[in-house]
UniProtKB/Swiss-Prot annotation:
One of its GO terms (cellular component) is plasma membrane. Keywords: Cell membrane, Membrane, Transmembrane, Transmembrane helix. This is UPF0324 membrane protein Bd1437. Belongs to the UPF0324 family. It comes from Bdellovibrio bacteriovorus (strain ATCC 15356 / DSM 50701 / NCIMB 9529 / HD100). The lineage of its organism: Bacteria, Pseudomonadati, Bdellovibrionota, Bdellovibrionia, Bdellovibrionales.
């Protein structure tokens, strides 16, 4: 048996043991959000991920359950107020990001579908938006992989960079929560980033991000109409995947708000949900395998980075001068 093949088999065996143990460790409070993400990336790059399909599926389901659990620790009245306040700048932000993203994609001569997926992932809520729009525009599997790989890498960067910038600029918890919700791609990374910054930041960031995620459905519908205008497409323009976990979040918040006796239980559920989110971040890191990193070409990555920098900078500037508050 060749030495290289033997070494590969040994790595796979070690990885099959190491990944479940690492995921279990992330449930404990001594593992931070950033540490969990880094641990997942290191294991994936060093050993490879023998559970790629499972970790992607678990990431989606665990994130949904965790977000619902976070609702059990929040006041519905506060959630409603914060969500309604964010409608105006959410509409402006999504529209601006979609237009700028498509412009950058054309300038860099990136495949139309890949550019659309990266843009919509940046504009709304990362991987969830990409997963919803991909079947609508009939995107090929490699185009979806490139878009997801780009977004996942930027999510990982955000978990480290955003809290550091927040502390450097002495942002308030509300300011940081708003900035994270409007400038970080995925809900999981928004929660991971704001979780490091403070409880008020977590509440604001989660609420505004979930309100933003609701735009998956209308934006996906409009993209479908734009792509196939003038064409008769069998089965329609595709169906958007509805973010049902947002409804679960609102129901959980309503229960603890309207039934005070449930609040002690709600706090326990919220605590467990926060730890589950740390595990989710580990799984996100575990999805950044060598294959994923190689699949992202330089042009799509430049589009993702350039668009993200502009969106994050403009949003931060608007928050600092008081346009967004």
């Amino acid at each position: 048996m060749p030495a290289a093949h033997s070494e590969s088999m040994n790595k796979t065996k070690i990885a099959k043991i190491a990944f479940p143990i690492a995921a279990l460790l992330c449930f404990f409070p001594f593992v931070s959000s950033a540490a969990a993400l880094v641990l997942g990336i290191v294991l994936a790059v060093a050993l490879g991920n023998p559970y790629v399909d499972k970790t992607r599926s678990y990431t989606h389901h665990l994130l949904s359950l965790s977000v619902i659990g976070l609702g059990a620790g929040m006041d519905l009245m506060v959630v409603g107020r914060v969500g309604l306040q964010g409608i105006g700048y959410t509409v402006v932000g999504i529209s601006f990001t979609l237009l700028l993203g498509m412009l950058i994609g054309r300038m860099l001569k990136i495949e139309r579908d890949t550019s659309t997926l990266i843009t919509v992932g940046t504009a709304i809520c990362g991987g969830s938006a990409i997963a919803a729009v991909a079947p609508t525009i009939r995107a090929k599997s490699h185009e979806v992989s490139v878009a997801l790989g780009t977004v996942f890498m930027l999510n990982a960067c955000a978990l480290v960079i955003f809290p550091w910038i927040g502390h450097l600029l002495n942002l308030t918890q509300t300011q940081f929560g708003l900035w994270s919700a409007l400038a970080i791609h995925d809900t999981s990374s928004v929660v991971g980033s704001t979780l490091q910054y403070g409880p008020e930041s977590l509440q604001v960031g989660t609420t505004v991000k979930l309100a933003r995620a609701l735009w998956i459905v209308p934006v996906t519908f409009l993209i479908g109409l734009f792509y196939f205008r003038g064409q008769k497409v069998e089965g329609g323009a595709g169906k958007a995947k509805k973010p049902w976990f947002i409804l679960g979040f609102l129901i959980a918040a309503a229960l603890v708000t309207w039934i005070p006796e449930l609040r002690p239980v709600g706090h326990v559920v919220e605590t467990v949900a926060k730890r589950a989110l740390v595990v989710t971040l580990f799984l996100i890191g575990a999805n950044l395998t060598k294959e994923t990193l190689k699949s992202v070409g330089i042009k799509p990555f430049l589009q993702g980075v350039g668009l993200w920098i502009v969106v994050a900078s403009c949003t931060l500037g608007a928050i600092l001068i008081g346009w967004i508050h």
